């Protein structure tokens, strides 16, 4: 369901003039000559690069230019590339390395802490500062030249069960920081911080603290915003996906739809006020979230130029919304999903009561890891395809009343799953092609380029180059499990592909021409 806050959303009549192409480029932040300066590459979340030096015709010729071993856990972060420096993270660690040679410029190690060390998404860079979130829910500002700490502020109380893996989103003078925490019954929060001082500017609650008058979440907590959002400067709206409600599997303890959990919310970055919200899964009892990336596209839909936001959600459904208002335009499954009986008038799947967690277990698809997850999709404007790492999987969900109404409040067990990269037609939701990625769930996101290439990883530890038009394999390399989204950058006239495999970063490029 979409809820619109009166007077806040820009009408479609005020939208910018669209170009004559079917899908237009939403120019929101400059991808400085070949750099990758934000988590998604730009504000749209499309993860589409304009670089064209590496093509379908020559990608088989790329060779390893450099590698960098972190010595820590699996890299799940998107590297940031700015001013010839690569910034990459792991829990408690930030590295600055030379983008030409992988020479380490500095390394920051956060003090030992009792936070939850599940992974890390990356940093934000602003002027001469690098911003990093910590496992115990702090935000640290580092000097971009030296790695020295400028300031350190608390975003949320780790003793209550909050942590952060979030790559902050910088919107003008607002640094938006999300947290996680669904082992406890905690309200979902997104905090805006002054990047100069660390002072809190505002806090948005997806589920208000218990006891809040007129609480729209129907007594649920949760709805954490742990993934990096997207931004439309023309509407001045930030789009963020929210997580699951808590207690996670105990639905009877939180009757109702549980707004704004499992939702896409549109917020004013200057005030934190909600413009509208769309709930992808009402009353979620399977830990599916809707934290996945809200991708912004300016395109023709149903014959009309429209400002769109689309999401391949963890519940196995693909959504296309009008981002002026949050009105649903399309809802289609993109992965195996047996938990709904249909789609309601607001574009939301209708839950099947027979698939609710039960004492004797219920076989449900997707499983707890979802039809997709944190791994980012990519939108290719030339083909109009959203490339999504999909997971077809079943799990058995249990609910036991004696587990109570706190935290997880039940159990679930994955049974079987396979992965595929699926190319979704944004106008119909149809799968135009798919490329099998193997047994289990892939941890790799997706990158597309203007030359017609798609990069991702499979479950066997290979990074892949595919032809975007049909999914044909053009190149691959075994590097260990890929847990992040590939990026690309250009430096000194040379295009690089940068991917994390295991605990190392690998950069490929075409052979240098003889001088």
Model-derived features with residue positions:
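Aromatic (tryptophan-biased) beta-strands that constitute blades/sheets of beta-rich domains
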Residues: 31-70, 103-112, 148-157, 199-207, ...
């Amino acid at each position: 369901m979409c809820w619109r806050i009166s007077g806040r959303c820009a009408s479609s009549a005020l939208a910018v003039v669209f170009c004559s192409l079917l899908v237009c480029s939403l120019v929101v932040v400059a991808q400085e000559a070949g750099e990758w300066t934000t988590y998604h590459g730009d504000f749209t979340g499309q993860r589409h690069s304009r670089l064209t030096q590496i093509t379908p015709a020559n990608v088989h010729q790329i060779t390893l230019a450099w590698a960098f071993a972190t010595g820590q856990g699996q890299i799940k972060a998107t590297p940031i590339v700015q001013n010839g420096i690569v910034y990459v993270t792991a829990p408690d660690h930030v590295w600055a390395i030379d983008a030409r040679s992988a020479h380490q410029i500095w390394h920051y190690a956060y003090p030992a802490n009792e936070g939850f060390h599940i992974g890390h998404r990356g940093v934000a860079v602003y002027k001469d500062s690098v911003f990093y979130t910590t496992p115990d829910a702090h935000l640290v500002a580092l000097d971009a030249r030296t790695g020295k700490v400028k300031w350190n502020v608390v975003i949320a109380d780790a003793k209550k069960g909050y942590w952060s893996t979030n790559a902050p989103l910088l919107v003008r003078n607002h640094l938006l920081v999300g947290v996680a925490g669904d082992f406890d019954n905690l309200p979902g929060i997104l905090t805006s911080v002054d990047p100069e001082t660390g002072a809190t500017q505002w806090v948005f609650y997806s589920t208000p603290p218990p006891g809040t008058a007129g609480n729209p979440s129907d007594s649920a907590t949760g709805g954490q915003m742990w993934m990096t959002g997207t931004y439309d400067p023309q509407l001045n709206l930030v789009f963020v996906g929210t997580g699951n409600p808590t207690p996670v599997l105990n639905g009877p303890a939180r009757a109702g739809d549980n707004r704004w959990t499992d939702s896409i919310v549109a917020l004013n970055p200057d005030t934190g006020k909600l413009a509208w919200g769309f709930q992808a899964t009402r009353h979620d009892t399977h830990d599916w979230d809707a934290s996945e990336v809200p991708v912004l596209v300016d395109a023709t839909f149903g014959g009309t130029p429209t400002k769109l936001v689309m999401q391949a959600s963890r519940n196995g459904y693909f959504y296309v919304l009008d981002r002026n208002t949050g009105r649903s335009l399309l809802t289609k499954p993109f992965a195996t999903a047996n938990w709904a009986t249909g789609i309601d008038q607001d574009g939301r799947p209708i839950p099947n009561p027979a698939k609710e967690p039960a004492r004797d277990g219920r076989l449900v698809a997707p499983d707890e890891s979802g039809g997709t997850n944190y791994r980012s999709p990519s939108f290719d404007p030339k083909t109009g395809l959203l490339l999504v790492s999909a997971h077809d999987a079943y799990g058995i969900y249990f609910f036991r009343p004696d587990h109570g109404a706190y935290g997880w409040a039940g159990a679930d067990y994955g049974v079987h799953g396979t992965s595929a990269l699926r190319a979704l037609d944004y106008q119909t939701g149809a799968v135009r092609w798919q490329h099998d990625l193997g047994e289990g769930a892939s941890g790799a996101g997706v990158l597309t380029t203007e030359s017609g290439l798609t990069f991702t990883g499979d479950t066997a530890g290979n990074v892949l180059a595919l032809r975007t038009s049909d999914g044909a394999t053009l190149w691959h390399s075994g590097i260990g499990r890929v847990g992040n989204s590939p990026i690309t950058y250009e430096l000194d006239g040379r295009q690089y592909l940068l991917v994390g495999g295991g605990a190392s970063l690998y950069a490929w490029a075409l052979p240098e021409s003889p001088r």
